[in-house]
């Protein structure tokens, strides 16, 4: 059960009643264009979040200066979409960095409590088949339940001696495991793995791996690049294609897998706090992982509201990550299954 949280206006204590504080901000006082330009989302989306999170962000209080759920959400959206507690967001709604930080923490926790409501694989047979059909329509690969990949999100160094979060580029980060559908909606998100871990190790240690090993492998498979090991439920490209069928399969695999690249770009374009080219998340690894997950949840809610990222102009390009290519066991069950897939559908 969600625990209601009250956030008090720290700016009243810092500046007195003459200071313009967050609880004076009203959605009705600004235009729709202003909301989209400043906070990244239109009014109906923000209203939906207020209805969704309001009970978790407020409770009866004898203090008159408690920050309302509406304005807490605006503060958090301002951070997610700009990546900064300072300047633009602070000036826009007139609060201190401390107040912004507390609002971000509380909204993030309220979203994370609802993760399973917005990020999950379909369960009923009709929805599962619809998922496969949408992937098949992309490039002709049958049986696909999702596209899986990992992405690095930069964070501040936990401490000077801990190298477990240092990735292959020498930066402290989280290695986040994502699965998306054909539209780019996230079906799975694990955001707390160490930046030093290889992608295949992240998948191997995840709950997702156990889920497919025990149950979902009977329904279909995921697609992944060659940073992952070929498995009966995880189809990777042919490393050394020899036949026209191999090449056709690889081309279809690449075309299907590209939906994950677009999804990652959309996340970083919409939520600038994840864009490592600007800054790193200035939180502990645990809180940073929650922020990443909150952004994933908001990404899915945005898609439910038909708020796709229309233009990618100005988007940061994804930096190529070092790929550890694994040798393919030619006699494995997974290899035989992929060969059967290629012969049946790409010959």
Curated annotation (Swiss-Prot):
Amino-acid positions noted as binding a divalent metal cation in the UniProt annotation, renumbered to this chain: 149, 199, 225, 261
UniProt keyword ATP-binding present: no
Any GO molecular function: metal ion binding
Subcellular location: Nucleus; Cytoplasm
Keyword Hydrolase attributed: yes
Main localization (coarse): nucleus
Family per record: Belongs to the HARBI1 family.
Free-text function comment from the UniProt entry: Transposase-derived protein that may have nuclease activity (Potential). Does not have transposase activity.
UniProt-recorded name of the protein: Putative nuclease HARBI1
Organism: Xenopus laevis (African clawed frog)
Lineage: Eukaryota, Metazoa, Chordata, Craniata, Vertebrata
Gene symbol of the encoding locus: harbi1
